[in-house]
Amino acid sequence: MNDSEFHRLADSLWMTIEERLDDWDGDSDIDCEINGGVLTISFENGSKIIINRQEPLHQVWLATKQGGYHFDLKGDEWICDRSGETFWDLLEQAASQQAGETVKFR
């Protein structure tokens, strides 16, 4: 994958997250902000999830209260380089824990 393809795929990921949060109709307040390639999800309790892109490695990084995760694109899924879990699974787990209710992105 070249840099422009990586950015296109990361932009698509960011857009999907933003669209899902715009459609969020849960009880807790969840906000999303994109600034300079970093996506920040803020929760009502003050906690945050930070998602950023690591262009030199062509990875997406996810920082949550539970820890940090690095994802490589394998096929059409972003996969954690340590656990083998998908980006969406880990994001949904973290967002649900931090929101105090189930949050789905897919």
Curated annotation (Swiss-Prot):
Metal-binding keyword on record: yes
GO MF, one example: ferric iron binding
The UniProt record lists the keyword ATP-binding: no
Gene Ontology cellular component annotations, sorted alphabetically: cytosol
Biological process according to GO: iron-sulfur cluster assembly
Keywords from the named record: Iron, Metal-binding
Domain of life according to the entry: Bacteria
Transmembrane regions listed in the UniProt entry: none
Purpose of the protein: Involved in iron-sulfur (Fe-S) cluster assembly. May act as a regulator of Fe-S biogenesis.
Family classification: Belongs to the frataxin family.
Name of the protein this chain belongs to: Iron-sulfur cluster assembly protein CyaY
Species in which this protein is naturally found: Klebsiella pneumoniae subsp. pneumoniae (strain ATCC 700721 / MGH 78578)
